[in-house]
Every structure is written in C-alpha cells, then in structure tokens.
Amino acid sequence: VEHEMFGWQRIDHDKRYDMAGELFDVLHRLWGETENFSYEGKLNPWAINSGWITPKPAFGRPPLVTATGSPAGIDFAARHSDLVFVTSPGGAHIDSALETLPDHIATIKNRAKAYGRQVKMLINPIIVSRDTEREAIAYADAIEAGKPQSGTRAFATNNYDSDAHAWRGHTATDLRHSVGGAIGGNVQLIGSPETIA
C-alpha cells in the first residue's frame, strides 16, 4: 500500500530482496575497499562513478538487522545480516511457536553457515504479565480497549494480507488475545510470571 502512496509500482517480493542484496554488495565494497570504484546497477536504477566513502566504519561495517520469514529474505539475511528478527511460522499460539521456531531458526543459521557467516536470532514475543493470570488478562483487555481502531485495522490489512512471509500463519482471529492487534502479532505470553515461565 505504501508504494501506491508514492505512485510506485509494486515490486515482486523476491526481486525486492535481490535489489537490496545488490545495494548491500555495493555498500560492503564502499565500507571495505580503499580504492575508488564505479558500478552500474544491474537490478537497481542507479550507478556509482568513482565511488568511495570516508571515514570508513570503525568496526568494518555497521551491524545489519533484518526481519524475515521467506526463502528470499532468509537468503538475504544469511548473506548480509548480523541479527535477524523472526516470527513464529506457526502463528501466535505458544504451543505452535515452540513446535515451529526451532526448525525455522535452524534453517536461517544453516543458510548463513553455507555463506561462511553466523547470525544471531531475536524473537519479539508480546509479554503481558501481572501477579495473577486474571490481572494479566484484565491488563491486556485494557491495552486492547485503548488501541486506535483505524490504525490497528490498517496494520492488520497491510501485514496479514501482504506478501510478507513472516506474517503467514498469523491471523487476527487466531491470536490468544486480541491485544496482539494492538501491540503486534508475534507469540503471545499473557499471564502470571509463573504461568509464563
């Protein structure tokens, strides 16, 4: 939807990662090479003439953080990322997340290993905790009651129905609590510290 706002045509999901990969290949050269170089974009409509940057990054290159769930995104993350946000391919329910996340994480790490790299994973669950489960659910209800309805609908429309693979398996109706629509759609942990642990 955002691309339409700027009058752009939607670019195919996998091609977007290929284009980003080309950009980061060039950035790695800019960060690491000591001689100027020229480059004509193959997938992107840009060129670099006698390019260089100074000063160079102090630690080789800035860390790159991505979020992905698709094969094309996983390949991009394996080649370029240092930290990868992952969502549960099984949806927001903790049982399905615990069942599907280990293989999903192993896939990403193994792909990075094939490129001679290591990546770290970050899972961002929704945690709503209070002294008792009843208090936690009441607090989650309060969050839900205070959410902006139009923004939440737009978020759900743009993510649940998009071509973003990370949201596959997540629907507005399968969330344990609708608080996910207010503060995200990842794994939901709602309860007392004892029940969450």
State each model region's role.
Residues 4-6, 76:
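Short, solvent-exposed loop/turn and secondary-structure capping segments
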Residues 6-9, 13-57, 88, 94-197:
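An alpha-helical appendage that flanks or caps ligand/catalytic pockets
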Residues 29, 78-79:
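Solvent-exposed polar/charged
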Residues 61-63:
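Short active-site oxyanion
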Residues 67-76, 191-197:
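Short, acidic/polar
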Residues 79-85:
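Glycine-enriched alpha-helix->loop->beta-strand junction motifs that scaffold or abut catalytic
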